[in-house]
Amino acid sequence: MYGYWSHFLCDVGAHEISRKRRYRQEKFLETTGYLFAFRNGLVEEIPTDVAEDTIIPYYVYNKGYMIGYAEDAKVYVKWPTDMKDWMKQKKRAADAHTKLTNYVKDFPKVKSFFGEIIWGVVGLGKVLRYPKTPKEFLWTVFLFPTRMAMWISLHYELKFKKREYSDGWRENLEVESTRTLD
């Protein structure tokens, strides 16, 4: 189920609803941290508490370069295999996006709680066409309250527990089930 959810969020959310549309409109678009490249010397410093796959393309885009989008690129990713790791990964990524305006005041918000709701409704046809089996349809339905729980939990941790997320390869933020096999 966690692999399906991860594929769904990438295929439908990141690519179908966001990146393809923004690329066609020649707007700023986020890259994926799983595969992106940029010309040496364009970025001097990368903050560790934000989404590097978003801040780096913004720096490049802000210098007048167009961000390319290779729709057919293939990347193999080991997704989380349990709820604890899935939540940890998603909360870390969501929080990293909330901090972007700390570095760039006019940052074009692409990923947010309200953005997920709005674009989920706008792209509802794509959302409902993605599942191929009844089991996948149920997993898709279960994803919505799980994402809501993730956002509520993140908000609670940030506002009331004063928890700060940072670079995922430090502290206890590494997602254990996504580590490669040795």
Predicted regions and their residues:
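Terminal low-complexity segments of carbohydrate-biosynthetic enzymes
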Residues: 95-182
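Residue-identity detector for glycine
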Residues: 3, 13, 33, 41, ...
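Broad hydrophobic/π-residue packing in well-ordered secondary structure
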Residues: 38, 43, 65, 69, ...
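Long helical/loop segments within the catalytic core of UDP-sugar-dependent glycosyltransferases
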Residues: 1-44, 87, 91-94
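Residue-level detector of alpha-helix boundaries and kinks
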Residues: 27-28, 45, 75, 130, ...
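Short C-terminal domain-edge/linker segments immediately following a structured domain
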Residues: 21-28, 66-68, 98-102, 176-177
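Catalytic donor/gating beta->alpha subdomain of glycosyltransferases that bind UDP-sugars
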Residues: 1-5, 9-11, 47-111, 115
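Short, conserved alpha-helical segments within structured domains
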Residues: 34, 52-53, 141
